[in-house]
Amino acid sequence: MNPETLFDFPEAKGIVISGDIHGEFNKLVFKCCVQYGMTDTVIIVAGDCGFGFEQQGYYENVYNRNRGRLSKSNNWILFVRGNHDNPAYYIELPIKHRRWMTVPDYSVVRACGHEILCVGGAISVDRSHRMNHSAYNLPKQDEPLARNIYWANEYPVFDADKLDAISEDFAIDTIITHTAPSFCELTSKGGLFAEMAIRDEDLTEDVKNERQVMDRILDYLTSNHHPLRYWFYGHFHQSWQAIDNEGIQYNMLDIMELKELGAKD
C-alpha cells in the first residue's frame, strides 16, 4: 500500500468523527479543543469540508490561526473529500500539515486499535444550478486549486485494486465516507432532489450509481472478511443510526455533529 495513504497515530487516545463543516474550520477547532476540551484526539471530518471555495492562501491562513490550539491539545484533524471539496486538494496537491491534512480516497487511518478506511465523494444534487451560477469557472489544468463552486469529478469511485492492496495489510473495522450505501437514510427523493431532477435529466441515475459504489465497497469488505463494525457518513444534513443483521452500526451525522468512536474491544 502507498505509504502516503496510511495515516498512523500511535499517540492518539481518542477518535471523533464530524459531519459536514462547510468551511467552518475555526468553529470546528473551537468546538473540539475548547468547548469539549478534547485532547490526544484524531478528529475526522466526513466530507464537505469546504476546500476550494476560497483561494489556497485562505486555507493556509486558517491552519496557521488554529495550529497552536491543535498542538496544545495534541489533536489532529483529517478531512475526507465531499462533493463540496475540490478533489485537487486530495489528489494532486493534498494538504499535509502535521495536525491538519486532507485524506485521499482509499486511505487508511490507524489509531486506538482501529483500522479505518476513508473513501470520499458524492453527487451535488444542485450541480445544474452551480454550473449556471456566475461564480462557476471552467477548470484550468494549470490552476488545479483555483477558486470555484463545483467540481465535475466529485463522485465516488469503486477501486478494487486499492481495496485488494488494503486487504493485504489491514483488517478494516470502520469506514468513513461522505455518502452512504443505498439502504441507509436518506432514501427519500423528495424536496430539493425532486426539484433539481426536473432540470438535470441524469441526476437520478448518477445518484443511484453513487450509492451503488458504497454498496460495492460494503460487499467487498464483508466478502473479504474484514471485521467491519462501524460506518460513518455525512452529506444528508440529518442524524440517524441503525444496526444491520451483521452487527454493523451505520451513523449518519448532521452538520457539525460529533460522534466518538470508542477504543476497539
What are these model-derived regions, one by one?
Residues F9, R110-C112, R216-N224, F236-D265:
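Binuclear metal-dependent phosphoesterase catalytic core
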Residues I17-G19, I43-D48, W76-H84, T102-P104, ...:
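Active-site neighborhood of phospho(di)ester-bond hydrolases with catalytic His/Asp-centered motifs
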Residues E24-N26, G52-E54, N86-Y90, V109-C112, ...:
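Short catalytic/ligand-binding loop motif for oxyanion handling, primarily in non-cytosolic enzymes
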Residues Q35-T39, S167-F170, H225:
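Glycine-rich phosphate-binding loop signature in dinucleotide/nucleotide-binding domains
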Residues H114-Q212:
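Active-site-proximal loop/helix segment associated with metal-binding centers of metalloenzymes
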